Amino acid sequence: MGIQNRVALITGSASGMGKQTALRFAEQGAAVVINDIDAEKVRATVDEFSARGHRVLGAVADIGNKAAVDGMVKQTIDAFGRIDILVNNAGMERAGALRKLSEADWDVTINVNLKGTFLCTQAVHGHMVENKHGRIVNIASRAWLGGAGQTPYSSAKAGVVGMTRALAIELGRAGITVNCVAPGLIHTPMWDELPEKDQQFLLSRQPTGKLGEPDDIANTLLFLADDDSGFVTGQVLYVCGGRSLFAG
């Protein structure tokens, strides 16, 4: 059945994996909502998608702010009449040894990755319950299994996995599936910001010896958002080139 004529709200979708996911969804006939905290990036992405003939809406919002999230959801429903798919993609990382991490590092990492996922899901779920249909896909990370120097990020993403499982149980009888994708090393702006020596070290521990691409994530999200994936819920799908086979 696909996702044609469905409405997808994708957070953090003005760049990287989120943008590629929004593009894949739009190419499959969905109306997409581009969200980011950066208004200029949102505007540029909306213009790009519109020029390709896609149905698109821009929503500038800080997903860690309840009022902003509620406003974004209202904006989406006012424009398209409903929300069928939510992809909680927005995320960020503050890495470092435990002794060097500040309270602010912890707070911002939890706020964006975990609280933002909670607020967005809470804001859309009632609408999905009314429609007796919904696809919610959360982006975790292979890092939820733990990684040195990733205490805030690993904690946040482990929370996302726990939230995914709890909500799959709570919302299943309402026709809503809740799943989680755990990417490994993906070629995104976050990757490009890493020092070359860190990139080489990480790739040396990658079974495939190479990075994944945003389209690898987008295709997995497309599968989970599809109407035909209604019997898949509460799952964590690793898209990591085998990296999850190894600890640390």
UniProtKB/Swiss-Prot annotation:
Pfam families cross-referenced by the UniProt entry: adh_short_C2 (PF13561)
Binding site for NAD(+): S15, D36, D62, I63, N89, Y153, K157
GO terms for MF: oxidoreductase activity, acting on the CH-OH group of donors, NAD or NADP as acceptor
Protein induction: Induced by toluene.
Keywords, comma-separated and alphabetical: NAD, Oxidoreductase
EC number per UniProt: 1.1.1.429
Sections of the chain in a coiled coil: none
Full protein name: (2S)-[(R)-hydroxy(phenyl)methyl]succinyl-CoA dehydrogenase subunit BbsD
Organism placement in taxonomy: Bacteria, Pseudomonadati, Pseudomonadota, Betaproteobacteria, Rhodocyclales
